[in-house]
Amino acid sequence: MAVPKRKVSPHRRGNRRAHDSLKVEAFHECNNCGELKRPHNMCSHCGFYNGREVLAPSL
């Protein structure tokens, strides 16, 4: 069974866990309709990406 050879100090433990926290999702306003959308992704509301219609919106 695996057992740690030495005690891990609180500083090392904190450094290891530094990237474990959840990140806040980034959102931007769509230039076409104003709805919130993920950056570098098509707007799911109007179907536009980078000023062009990529997908016709399903109504």
Swiss-Prot record:
It comes from the Bacteria. Pfam families: Ribosomal_L32p. Gene3D superfamilies: Single helix bin. The keyword RNA-binding does not apply. SUPFAM superfamilies: Zn-binding ribosomal proteins. GO terms for molecular function: structural constituent of ribosome. GO terms for cellular component: large ribosomal subunit. Residues 1-16 have a biased composition (Basic residues). Keywords: Ribonucleoprotein, Ribosomal protein. One of its GO terms (biological process) is translation. PANTHER family: 50S RIBOSOMAL PROTEIN L32 (PTHR35534), LARGE RIBOSOMAL SUBUNIT PROTEIN BL32 (PTHR35534:SF1). Belongs to the bacterial ribosomal protein bL32 family. HAMAP family: Ribosomal_bL32. This is Large ribosomal subunit protein bL32. It comes from Erythrobacter litoralis (strain HTCC2594). The gene is rpmF.
